[in-house]
Design a protein with these regions (language model features):
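C-terminal catalytic core of tyrosine-transesterase DNA break-rejoin enzymes
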Residues: 127, 145, 194, 198, ...
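C-terminal secondary-structure termini that scaffold catalytic or DNA-interacting sites
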Residues: 218, 231-233, 237-245, 249-254, ...
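N-terminal core-binding DNA-recognition domain of tyrosine site-specific recombinases/integrases
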Residues: 3, 67-153, 165, 187, ...
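Active-site/catalytic core of tyrosine-dependent DNA strand-transfer enzymes
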Residues: 83, 173-177, 226-229, 251-296
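N-terminal DNA-binding module of tyrosine recombinases/phage integrases
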Residues: 7-13, 17-108, 263, 268-270
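Catalytic-site neighborhood detector that most strongly recognizes the C-terminal catalytic loop/helix
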Residues: 170, 227, 280, 318, ...
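DNA/chromatin major-groove-contacting recognition/catalytic segments
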Residues: 178-182, 232-238, 338-358
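Basic, Lys/Arg- and aromatic-enriched nucleic-acid-binding interface segment
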Residues: 123-126, 130, 145, 149-209, ...
Length: 358
């Protein structure tokens, strides 16, 4: 395992042959190392990776994990996972050998995450802590399932955090109408919030909409994509889940509003985004509108909860609502169970009648 000096650059490089997973011999060259030791260490880790040798460092295995998983996930999903890996997991585990990571190491890492406070003294939320642990566990589980690691130290150590989500807030119809009236001074904001409230779509789905997504003759809105801003780029991805691809019937008043809005956009093209604003813009507008209307501030996503709440109040079933908002019906039943009217009284009355008839 030799390393070579690059006399022109004053650095070291590794150059060697290896067999890839198909048994084909290939040459590998990597430049820019400060010392011979660094070059040799990199070559050693690379060869351990190729052999899937579990004495490789955790950092080396993460590169294998990235190769295996990245192409299988939506770009925005991977971006979130990668940020967690690079900033919250690798700084602690990168130098440890994969096979030597113990539950006590995971517990020590968990304690660091639990003790973290930002400059304002704020800790990580329970749901974020659970997400961090879940990502570490996913990496180690990948090693167990596909590369022969004996056990998942993160699973043995146990989880941290919880699945308790932020309080679900929503506006009543009356609150939304007050807000909407304030928004009328900015047509783009007004129509964006009209779609969010009356159709219950996600923020990314809204920002991806183009004229081609509307069939105004039939009052239909097709949800087939989502917008994300990733690393300074506008990215159009598939919707969140396969169930999210759907066609929504719009109420007639909203169909008329969208027809007017599309006519007002100068030379809009069929595939051009009709809301070329950022998520932060919508959040700012939500702040402004809630304050001026005198209604409580809710999150953009809570407009989706508000739509579901309205449909439940109108008497629609969980299945019908799920089809409209792109959820599984069991998710609607679970998340919004407290909003559905109780059938217990009706059940008791009918059972009473059955007993009397007997």
């Amino acid at each position: 395992m030799p390393a070579y000096k690059d006399n022109r650059q004053g650095t070291w490089y590794a150059s060697f042959y290896f067999e890839n997973w198909q048994g084909v011999k290939q040459k590998k060259l990597k430049r820019g190392f400060a010392t011979k030791k660094d070059a040799l260490a990199w070559e050693r880790e690379f060869l351990l990776q190729q052999a899937a040798d579990l004495t490789m460092t955790f950092e080396a295995f993460v590169e294998i994990y990235i190769t295996d998983k990245k192409k299988r996930l939506r770009e925005n999903t991977w971006s979130t996972k990668e940020h967690i890996i690079r900033t919250k997991i690798l700084p602690y585990f990168k130098e440890k050998k994969l096979s030597e990571i113990k539950p006590r190491d995971v517990i020590a890492w968990q304690n660091e995450m639990l003790n973290y406070r930002d400059k304002n003294g704020k800790a990580y939320s329970p749901t974020y802590l659970k997400t961090l642990h879940g990502q570490l566990s996913a990496i180690l589980n990948h090693a167990v399932r596909f590369y022969g690691l004996k056990s998942n130290a993160a699973a043995t150590a146990g989880c941290m955090g919880s699945e308790k989500h932020k309080e679900m807030l929503f506006w009543t119809k009356e609150e939304y109408l007050k807000f909407a009236e304030v928004m009328m001074d900015k047509p783009q904001s007004y129509y964006a919030f009209e779609i969010l409230y009356w159709c219950g779509i996600r923020e990314g789905e809204l920002l991806a909409l183009t004229p081609a997504d509307f069939d105004l003759d039939k009052g239909l809105l097709s949800i087939t994509k989502s917008y994300q801003r990733l690393k300074g780029r506008d990215v159009i991805t598939d919707p969140k889940t396969p169930k999210s691809v759907r066609v929504i019937q719009m109420p007639q008043f909203l169909t008329d509003e969208i027809r007017d809005y599309l006519k007002s956009i100068y030379k809009v093209q069929p595939d051009q985004r009709i809301f070329e604003v950022t998520k932060s813009y919508l959040h700012h507008e939500m702040d402004r509108g809630a304050k001026e209307a005198g209604v409580k501030r809710i999150r953009i996503h809570d407009l989706r909860h508000s739509h579901v709440s309205l449909l439940i109040e109108m008497g629609f079933s969980a299945l019908a609502i799920a089809d409209r908002v792109g959820h599984e019906s069991v998710d609607i039943t679970y998340k919004y169970a407290h909003l559905f009217p109780s059938k217990q009284q009706e059940m008791a009355q009918k059972l009473n009648m059955e007993r009397k008839e007997g």
